[in-house]
Amino acid sequence: MNNNAQNKRSLDDSNGNDTKRPKQEDPKYILPKQVNTYPATLPERKKNIEYILNILTKKQPNITNPKLKAIDIEYEIAKKSTNATYKTVFRQEVFKLTKPTKSPSQLSPQQEHLKKLDQEAKELKILKEMVVSRKTLIAFGYIMEPPESIPNEKITRICNRCGTEFRLDQQLQPIVCEFHHGKKQRGKYICCMSNVDGQPCSKAKNHVYLLNTPEEKQALLPYQFTKELFTTTSTKSKSRVLGIDCEMGFTTKGFELMRITAIDYFTSKTVLDIFIKPIGEIVDFNTRYSGIHELTDDFLSWEQSMEKLGEIMDSETILIGHGLENDMNAMRLIHENIIDTSILFPNKWKTGPTRRWSLKDLAFEFLSRRIQTGEHDSCEDSIAAIDIVKYFVKKRLQSIGSSS
């Protein structure tokens, strides 16, 4: 019997049709089930099945047919994913699998609900105390008032990657742009560990640039106050606390917003994951960091994206992120309730506007979690920022409990 037949039978069994079927055994080899879409390559899907299998066997040593179970889990992921969303959905499912199993509660459903509400109220009180002051937000580069609009009238720009001056009207003409995609640390580039004067390790076909001033950004797309943009009439549907992360790509208009991902703090569920069509013509999707490969029919207009965002948040919603001023600038939003993990650390970290720890380092330090090991994933970053905040909230709750 081949692997496909075994996989089909395992799916039938899971639907309750096992009364007339012989007991199934794990296949000798792992083979992903076929789906109508093409969310990922076969080797990548197989690797992910093996990853799921490893989790299952560690958490449930006595599980029956773990390979079939892992194949089925990955199949459900692939079935509801596209090439753009497969990695995100996979990471979300892995997160669910790795969450600690809760012991059965002796409380009634009503008591459980009341206990949950009480816990959330305690956490929300602490979160409100953690909101960064307006003065500090300004010091860390947040725009808190709409700037003057100064249109871009330059005919040349400096490439953000290689430092070459180029003409804007020739930006889409193919050239060779050589650069290091990693930052400099202790005299070396972290992307290839070469010296500062070493040969660039990356190449691109076009030069790219940023709108460097708030005034230029205001001229392209104006900033808006969330208290004016988002209604507060139906607060029940709004999230009280959100982890948010944005992805940008290079266009002929600079560095534009192309994706918004929002995770609810209390449920860890993705409540928003949308793609935005930029104003300018695409120059570089910045895939290494954005995870975006192409424009599809799923991309929304700017106005549509703001409508979607307004469905889940308002001016009272606390937003959590890392270096969130970049995301707020990308969305052109002015918001008061911010918790920025690049700002809120113990004094020993000596965080300042010009010296901040990366989300990757913080996740490893406080969560013992390695993130950003492959292609960038906005959901992973949002969850990491939320979990870092939860780490401090938990410590605060423990401190309150021990002193009472």
Curated annotation (Swiss-Prot):
<dbReference type="InterPro" id="IPR013520">
    <property type="entry name" value="Exonuclease_RNaseT/DNA_pol3"/>
</dbReference>
<dbReference type="GO" id="GO:0003676">
    <property type="term" value="F:nucleic acid binding"/>
</dbReference>
<dbReference type="GO" id="GO:0004527">
    <property type="term" value="F:exonuclease activity"/>
</dbReference>
<dbReference type="GO" id="GO:0031125">
    <property type="term" value="P:rRNA 3'-end processing"/>
</dbReference>
<comment type="function">
    <text>3' to 5' exoribonuclease required for proper 3' end maturation of MRP RNA and of the U5L snRNA.</text>
</comment>
<dbReference type="InterPro" id="IPR012337">
    <property type="entry name" value="RNaseH-like_sf"/>
</dbReference>
<feature type="domain" description="Exonuclease">
    <location>
        <begin position="241"/>
        <end position="389"/>
    </location>
</feature>
<dbReference type="InterPro" id="IPR047021">
    <property type="entry name" value="REXO1/3/4-like"/>
</dbReference>
<dbReference type="GO" id="GO:0005634">
    <property type="term" value="C:nucleus"/>
</dbReference>
<keyword id="KW-0539">Nucleus</keyword>
<feature type="region of interest" description="Disordered">
    <location>
        <begin position="1"/>
        <end position="29"/>
    </location>
</feature>
<keyword id="KW-0963">Cytoplasm</keyword>
<keyword id="KW-0378">Hydrolase</keyword>
<dbReference type="GO" id="GO:0005737">
    <property type="term" value="C:cytoplasm"/>
</dbReference>
<keyword id="KW-0698">rRNA processing</keyword>
<protein>
    <recommendedName>
        <fullName>RNA exonuclease 3</fullName>
        <ecNumber>3.1.-.-</ecNumber>
    </recommendedName>
</protein>
<keyword id="KW-0269">Exonuclease</keyword>
<feature type="compositionally biased region" description="Polar residues">
    <location>
        <begin position="1"/>
        <end position="17"/>
    </location>
</feature>
<keyword id="KW-0540">Nuclease</keyword>
<dbReference type="InterPro" id="IPR036397">
    <property type="entry name" value="RNaseH_sf"/>
</dbReference>
<feature type="compositionally biased region" description="Basic and acidic residues">
    <location>
        <begin position="18"/>
        <end position="28"/>
    </location>
</feature>
<comment type="similarity">
    <text>Belongs to the REXO1/REXO3 family.</text>
</comment>
<dbReference type="InterPro" id="IPR034922">
    <property type="entry name" value="REX1-like_exo"/>
</dbReference>
